[in-house]
Amino acid sequence: MPRSQKNDNFIDKTFTIVADILLRIIPTTQREKEAFTYYRDGMSAQSEGEYAEALQNYYEAMRLEIDPYDRSYILYNIGLIHTSNGEHAKALEYYFQALERNPSLPQAFNNMAVICHYRGEQAIQQGDSETSEAWFNQAADYWKQAIALAPSNYIEAQNWLKITDRLK
């Protein structure tokens, strides 16, 4: 039974019903419907912390989905899973791929900045201030791009940029 048919919570059930209605109303191909079903099942599994299942669904959605914009969100979600698993290098790869297809994803820039900032903090703990500074500068660049796309978001990042004199 597909995950989308066994949702337990109200929000997932509501989303599934609305999505199914839209798929019937909006003219789409069978392939697009299948891709969306895998994507939806991936989101459901991801929200429950079932990352392996989510990845399987996302990879299947990627195999079927041809629209670059839709693919960007699949890639972004794969990046989120790798971030959650502490696989930061892999996460960055997927965020980059998402941005190649959709450069208007401020959340991808933000997540890349968070990873770079984390790596900068790690470098400080290892006593490597030069590497730390490089990571922090990279984080600043990504946060600036995220803020340019969503100026009212990422207030903590904006404050960090001001405090560290990287807002220029």
From Swiss-Prot:
Would you say which domain of life the source belongs to? Eukaryota
**Keywords, comma-separated and alphabetical:** Chloroplast, Membrane, Photosynthesis, Plastid, Repeat, Thylakoid, TPR repeat
In the UniProt record, does the keyword Plastid occur?
A: yes
GO terms, biological process: photosynthesis
The TPR repeat ranges on this chain:
35-68, 72-105, 120-153
**A single cellular component GO annotation:** chloroplast thylakoid membrane
Pfam families named in the record: TPR_1 (PF00515)
Subcellular location, in the record's words?
A: Plastid, Chloroplast thylakoid membrane
The UniProt similarity line reads: Belongs to the Ycf3 family.
Q: What does this protein do?
A: Essential for the assembly of the photosystem I (PSI) complex. May act as a chaperone-like factor to guide the assembly of the PSI subunits.
Q: What is the protein's given name?
A: Photosystem I assembly protein Ycf3
- Give the organism, scientific name: Physcomitrium patens (Spreading-leaved earth moss)
Q: Which gene encodes it?
A: ycf3
